[in-house]
Amino acid sequence: MDALDKARAEIDAVDAQLAALFERRMAAVLSVAQYKQAHGLPVYDAAREAVVLEKAAARIQNAALRPYYKDHVQNMMDVAKQYEAEVLGRNRAAYQGVEGAFAHIALRALFPHAEAVSYPTWDEVFDAVSRGDTAHGVVPFENSHAGDVSAVLDLCYNHPELWVVDVYDLPISQNLLVLPGTQLAQLKHVYSHQQAIAQSETFLKQFRLPATAMPNTAMAAKFVAESGDPSKAAIASAETAALYGLEVLVPSINTDGDNTTRFIVLSREKPTAGNRFSLLFTLDNKPGKLAEVIQVIGRFGYDMESIKSRPLPHVPFDYYFYVELVGDPSADETAALLRELDHTCRTVRLLGVYTK
């Protein structure tokens, strides 16, 4: 046996031991999950994870291997959380639309082992998470070309019981999908979500193709496929074309080549760890109040990555504001910032904590 064979044999022997230890570890995870279920505890415990990772690193004598072992332990904890969620019946995530929608693609990237549950509208996604029908909801929040999804931000404002616990940036390639064999000259009408239409505006104007908005891109593709009409086309992903038996006639028709949609993950469980946090607040209608808020944020040393305003529902000419800040939400400075903003703002609440 040469050196390579000996090394491989050693790896196989260690893997056999790891398999037995993995089963032993997952049995302990099951006990933890059952305890959490009995006591109504959340799956994710950020403080516990941090302690486990530090203890894991300390066990490795070879300093060069410590970061790799921490990654290994983090992966094991991620698997454990997925298993706990499944055991607790929380391994369900909601999205708007049908299979193949960009939200469905984002959900699959975020929760590869979860049951994806489809709802017709964003409102119903929020309601599903709020009721506990699903553990999470995945909805679009903003696009690098078409801007923010205002309706989703309004839903965040109207659901104070929900938290944003993660974000996911999905590169978007909008494609012109048609029935097999269709030529561009045959097309008379295009269907897609309003955001996809806006992202493809230059192409549509160039070929003078009128567009009709639909609830999402995958539903538009399904509609075109079921219509059997070669004069109709959809704007959607290449994955959607494969799902519904369509062809990509023209790829990447979006105006912005670097087209990205940010999705947010909703949960009833309050997040604790991250390097970004977002706030929603309202102000008295007095001169300089918004400037005062910005000064407070600056005085505490936080970088403000985003600020948006939206009309308050049922209150004419009054607004609420959204800000995203860079920093540790668990730091003492953050608690002090929120206390001061509580005096400066009419209302203020923490919306999300996540890592970017």
Model-predicted regions and their roles:
Residues 1-356:
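Domain-level signature for soluble enzymes in the chorismate/prephenate branch of the shikimate pathway
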